[in-house]
Amino acid sequence: MNPLHLPYRKLILAAVVCLTSQRFVVAADEPTLTGEQTKQFLLAAKVIGSRPASKGVTHTWRLTLTDGTLTHDADFQPIDEHKSEMKLASGTELNFVDSYKYNLAAYALAELLGIDDMVPVYVERKWKGQTGSMSWWLPSKMDEATRHKQKLTPPDPDAWNNQMYKIRVFDQLIADSDANLTNVLIGENWKIWRIDFSRAFRLNKEPKDPKDLVRCDRQLLEKLKALDANTLTEKTNHYLTKEELKAVMARRDKIVAQFQNMIAEKGENEVLY
């Protein structure tokens, strides 16, 4: 199964994304900061400009921040919606949650798994009386929906696939009910980022699409095996409920078991890289 030729998710937004959209910024002169430096900038830099983000249905804002030395844009998402029932295009969802807190939890989990280079840094911050998640505005060229529409092929299919395998494992772990092709951004040298987790961490204890689990990075599998509930609880702070944490660990168990079974059947070299 080659992820280069398969849809990233069954849910694909109908809107056509233009390459000149405000979401896409040029990578030239992009500052090189550590994760901790990025967090501190997002937490402390002054907001000097704002405008509604050009995409999405969760009322996000594109903010311009400066600390006096560095000026950079950030994404601010304050949504925190809880409903007993929500009617969506895909059907009715009970105990519906759409919350910026899941962005923070997803980044914390990505850090634990060693794949935080594939997820933008998210911090919790208040702006204009609203608390939300603030993330580094990424230097992307296009999203995965645009790549599919334009039928663009990555120059290094193996490197691309290895990134996509990680994203697929992460998605099965976090149970994002709104994952779609616009949530995968593509930057310089076909670098991939996964963004927007506000509808993740559903309570199902089984991976939604186990067939997406085709191959796995060796280090990622070891990190998955080592993940423990106490550390996850501590890292995600107050962002996840006890039931959401239990569901993550249950899905982790299923994912690890599936890869172990695949290794037993096919051999390690066919499954891990």
For each predicted feature, which ranges?
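Sec-dependent signal peptide hydrophobic core
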Residues: 11-16, 168
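Phosphate/dinucleotide-binding and metal-coordinating scaffold of catalytic cores
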Residues: 24-273
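Bacterial N-terminal signal peptides that target proteins for export
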Residues: 1-12, 21-22
